[in-house]
Design a protein with these regions (language model features):
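Primarily the internal scaffold of c-type cytochrome electron-transfer domains
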Residues: 1-102, 106, 111, 158-161
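Amphipathic alpha-helical scaffolding segments comprising HEAT/armadillo-like alpha-solenoid repeats
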Residues: 81-91, 113-125, 143-155, 171
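Leucine-rich solenoid repeat scaffolds
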Residues: 163, 167-170
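Extended hydrophobic/aromatic segments used for targeting, binding, or gating
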Residues: 123, 127-142
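Core register positions within helices of long alpha-helical scaffolds
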Residues: 107, 138-141, 169
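Secondary-structure transition/capping motifs at alpha-helix termini
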Residues: 11-13, 142-145
C-alpha cells in the first residue's frame, strides 16, 4: 500500500518523507504534468508510457469520471483563460474532496468573470467551511458594496472560523 499510495521523497539526502494525500497514482497524468510518479518507485526500469498503459490495463476506467485536478491547477498557475472552466468543474463536483474544491475556488479568484460568478455564489453556501472560507477570500477582490451583498449572510455562519473570516473580509 505504501509504495503506491504514500510514496516517499527524500529531502536533503537523509530525510525521507511520505506523501500523506493517499491518492490513487495516475502515471499518465504524472507524465503529462511532469509530476512525481509513484509507479516509478517500483518500476524504475520502465518508461512513463509503459506505466500509463499498465495502469490503464490493470485498472480500467480509474479516474476517467473525474475532472483532472492537476490539469485545472496547471492551467490556472500558467494564467491560461481556459482555467476558469476547468476550475469551476473541479469546484462544482460534489465527490471532489473539500480541500481540493476550496483550492479550486481560491485559484478561480484569478479568473473572475460573469461566467464564474455562479460558482462563487455556490461556494459561499457550500456545506464545507473550507470552501466557504475560500470563497470569502476571493470576495476580497470585489468592491466593498458587492462584497457585502455576497458575504453578509456568512456573518451568521454556525462556525466561528467562517464568521471571523467574513468579518475580516467585510470590515
Amino acid at each position: 500500500c505504501l509504495a503506491c499510495h504514500m510514496p516517499a521523497t527524500t529531502y536533503m539526502v537523509i530525510d525521507p518523507r511520505r506523501d500523506h494525500s493517499l491518492r490513487v497514482p495516475h502515471p499518465g497524468q504524472a507524465a503529462a504534468l511532469g509530476a512525481p510518479n509513484a509507479c516509478g518507485g517500483c518500476h524504475a526500469d520502465r518508461d512513463a508510457a509503459w506505466m500509463a498503459a499498465a495502469f490503464a490495463r490493470l485498472f480500467p476506467g480509474a479516474g476517467e469520471s473525474r475532472t483532472s485536478w492537476g490539469r485545472a491547477f496547471e492551467l490556472a498557475r500558467a494564467g491560461l483563460p481556459q482555467a476558469e472552466v476547468a476550475l469551476m468543474a473541479v469546484a462544482n463536483r460534489a465527490e471532489t474532496p473539500e480541500l481540493v474544491r476550496a483550492t479550486a475556488i481560491l485559484e478561480l479568484g484569478g479568473f473572475l468573470s460573469p461566467l464564474s460568478a455562479p460558482a462563487l455564489r455556490a461556494a459561499l453556501a457550500d456545506p464545507s467551511p473550507l470552501v466557504r472560507i475560500a470563497a470569502l477570500r476571493v470576495l476580497e477582490q470585489l468592491p466593498i458594496e458587492n462584497r457585502w451583498l455576497a458575504g453578509e449572510p456568512l456573518l451568521a455562519d454556525p462556525l466561528l472560523a467562517v464568521r471571523a473570516e467574513a468579518g475580516r473580509v467585510l470590515a
